[in-house]
């Protein structure tokens, strides 16, 4: 039967009020996020490039309200399998930053986003940083060397997303097939506790109290100690030189400066660098970061002890405490990066090397893939029915996600076993109905679960509020020996804590915002709002749950892809869909990254993004298409009209321009022998640019 003709079951009229609330969980509500289309940027290394000039202007047209044209193109894109791409529209902040408001020609954008290489390749969010990584590779360095140098560069040119004031996840696969995961995520200071923000919850996102103990330098140094070929100085010096000599402000940084101008102008450290003389830097201006250059040079010569101990550490702590923070010298000195076992999984005939907790990304992606592999292709992910199945699978996985946390503090054995189990995935798949969706309590457990199973696995029936993290940068590297590295680094929110340590030029993280806070006494939750997750409550020395999801994909023991992303919770859905696009739908590498994506994280409270206004007036062909998609709405729920889009409600979030993912793949049977050719892809919507040779 045509899935679009499947019947909808109507609830009794007297249940209309409940029905309207259930509407918030409907697939229709989610699919409106398709209007975000290409706003989520991606980069990577792939087999071949491709581009679709007809859809590159789509979001630009949405934002300029060319409704008849964009509606027709949107409907056409859906019917064609949505293989196009989209660029960011002329937002006011972008215009103020001096950004172009017209889309670049599709062919030149695609050409800048793709590099084919026989030996080694780097995909990052800035072509200058990718070039640094390439130079490291050509000078005899391996993928770890190139990854370290590239990530440090990203912290210089994209400080709103990452830097040495934050943390990172590093996934490494050696040429001999061994793999490891280095966790250098920020930790809560020793004086931290779960009630530390009670009465002033706003401080969890801004200021000194939101700062966790930075871990990036410790993690990069540990990776260097375990895997490097070159000297530490060789890897740190390029970023130090760039910070000292200055660099041109790219469009992405200019946009962020304009968007967060109040944050920058209100902080002496940030304003001195990014608004000298009170004038915000714009695209093409030269930015100088001498204080950061000085500490990077010291780190290059003397190693991470310069950062974590001694005079510079004391100065950093003093500044953070002056901002209201509780971080101490002992917190810095005691930080340790952790080597963890890689999370392993199989789906669609592929082997996945994923990030383990405190990342939630690896487990969620693996569970969704295991659910979807039980469907026949392409309806596991393509078309209206495929999208519905992806969404329902995401809802099941996100329902279990908030039981995860720092393994040093949380016993997650049963949860991880569920999320990696083929049998459990099959039972969840059987609870997905192709014509309806359900209220939240339906998800996270099989539909046919017995009372005995409910008692044995209570986590399946306890729903918790979702962590909604932000920001980050990602880098993928594959070298000539096919060592693969996938690194996600972050200061969490845009511009982290909104503070810069003046003496060191370090943008400070606000990683404490990634913890869950207990409910305030007397607070009345919103409808369908679950309680916060105890597994992610603040504890001294604890790492908060993360959405970062660096991944490496193998087929028959051979490296096939290196994938990762940036952008908070949308990392999970973005990386998932890049994998589905490339391996299951046969997209070219460029299209796999550039194609529109949807996002669902089970329960969220806000609908954000530059295309929000466009969602409120949805008529014509696109509206009709959404009505068909809405045929899988909650049993009996009623739809006011295709134009009725609440600005708040569970289960929807527009994908923003900050997101990025990377794909690195090898093509078998192509010279050099045994390894295959590399194609690096970086999404031009985030100023990304790959490099290789």
Which stretches of residues belong to each language-model region?
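Noncatalytic scaffold domains of N-terminal-nucleophile
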Residues: 2, 15-26, 41-89, 98-135, ...
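Hydrophobic membrane-insertion alpha-helices, especially the h-region
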Residues: 30-44
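Internal maturation/activation junctions in enzymes
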Residues: 65-66, 270, 277-278, 377-491, ...
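Alpha-helical support elements that line or immediately flank enzyme active sites
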Residues: 136-137, 218-226, 302-309, 314, ...
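Short, well-structured alpha-helical segments that form the helix of a local strand-helix-strand
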Residues: 144-151, 233-244, 315-318, 381-401, ...
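Active-site rim segments in enzyme catalytic domains, especially the processed small/beta chain
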Residues: 156-180, 327-328, 484-555, 585, ...
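Extended C-terminal subregions enriched in glycine
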Residues: 518, 525, 542-543, 575-576, ...
């Amino acid at each position: 039967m045509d899935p679009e003709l499947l019947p909808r079951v109507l609830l009794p009229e007297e249940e209309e009020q409940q029905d309207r609330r259930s509407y918030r969980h409907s697939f229709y509500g989610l699919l409106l996020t398709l209007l975000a289309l290409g706003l989520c940027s991606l980069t990577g290394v792939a087999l071949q490039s491709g581009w679709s000039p007809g859809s590159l202007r789509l979001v630009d047209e949405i934002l300029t309200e060319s409704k008849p044209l964009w509606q027709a193109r949107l409907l056409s894109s859906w019917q064609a399998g949505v293989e196009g791409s989209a660029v960011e529209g002329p937002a006011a902040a972008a215009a103020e930053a001096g950004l172009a408001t017209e889309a670049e020609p599709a062919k030149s954008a695609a050409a800048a986003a793709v590099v084919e290489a026989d030996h080694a390749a780097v995909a990052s969010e800035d072509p200058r940083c990718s070039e640094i990584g390439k130079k490291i590779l050509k000078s005899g360095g391996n993928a770890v060397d190139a990854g370290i140098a590239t990530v440090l560069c990203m912290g210089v040119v994209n400080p709103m997303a990452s830097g040495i004031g934050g943390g990172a996840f590093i996934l490494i696969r050696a040429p001999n097939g061994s793999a490891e995961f280095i966790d250098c995520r920020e930790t809560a200071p020793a004086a931290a506790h779960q009630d530390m923000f009670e009465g002033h919850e706003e401080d969890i996102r801004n200021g000194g109290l939101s700062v966790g103990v930075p871990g990036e330098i410790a993690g990069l140094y540990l990776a260097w100690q375990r895997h490097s070929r070159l000297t530490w100085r060789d890897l740190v010096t390029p970023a130090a030189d760039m910070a000292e000599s200055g660099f041109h402000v790219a469009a992405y940084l200019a946009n962020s400066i304009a968007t967060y101008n109040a944050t920058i102008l209100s902080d002496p450290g940030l304003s001195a660098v990014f608004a000298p003389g009170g004038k915000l830097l714009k695209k093409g201006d030269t930015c100088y970061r001498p204080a950061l250059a000085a500490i990077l040079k010291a780190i290059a010569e003397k190693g991470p002890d310069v950062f974590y101990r001694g005079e510079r550490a004391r100065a950093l702590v003093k500044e953070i405490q002056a901002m209201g923070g509780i971080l101490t010298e002992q917190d810095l000195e005691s930080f340790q990066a952790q080597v963890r076992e890689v999370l392993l999984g199989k789906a669609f005939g592929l082997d996945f090397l994923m990030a383990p907790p405190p990342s939630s990304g690896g487990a969620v992606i693996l569970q969704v893939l295991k659910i979807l592999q039980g469907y026949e292709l392409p309806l596991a992910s393509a078309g209206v029915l495929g999208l519905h199945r992806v969404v329902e699978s995401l809802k099941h996985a996100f329902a279990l996600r908030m039981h995860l946390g720092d393994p040093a503090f949380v016993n997650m054995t049963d949860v991880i076993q569920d999320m990696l189990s083929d049998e459990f995935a099959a039972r969840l798949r059987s609870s997905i109905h192709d014509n309806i969706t359900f209220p939240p309590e339906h998800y996270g457990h099989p539909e046919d679960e017995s009372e005995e199973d409910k008692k044995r696995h209570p986590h399946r029936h306890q729903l918790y509020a979702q962590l909604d993290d932000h920001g980050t940068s990602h880098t993928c590297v594959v070298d000539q020996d096919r060592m693969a590295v996938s690194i996600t680094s972050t200061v969490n929110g845009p511009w982290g804590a909104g503070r810069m340590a003046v003496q060191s030029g370090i943008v400070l993280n606000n990683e404490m915002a990634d913890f869950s806070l207990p409910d305030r006494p007397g607070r009345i939750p919103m409808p369908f709002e679950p309680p916060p997750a105890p597994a992610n409550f603040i504890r001294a020395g604890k790492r908060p749950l993360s959405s970062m999801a660096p991944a490496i994909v193998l087929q028959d023991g051979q490296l096939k892809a290196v994938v990762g992303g940036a952008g908070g919770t949308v990392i999970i859905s973005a990386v998932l869909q890049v994998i589905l696009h490339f391996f299951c739908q046969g997209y070219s590498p460029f299209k796999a990254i550039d194609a529109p994506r949807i996002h669902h994280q089970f329960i969220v409270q806000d609908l954000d993004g530059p295309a929000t206004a466009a969602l409120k007036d949805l008529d014509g062909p696109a509206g009709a298409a959404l009505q068909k998609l809405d045929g899988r709405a909650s049993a009996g729920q009623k739809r006011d009209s295709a134009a009725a889009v609440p600005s708040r409600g569970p289960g929807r979030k527009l994908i923003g321009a900050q997101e990025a993912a990377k794909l690195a793949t090898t093509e078998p049977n192509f010279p050099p022998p045994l390894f295959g050719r590399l194609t690096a892809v970086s999404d031009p919507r985030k100023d990304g640019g790959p490099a290789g040779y």
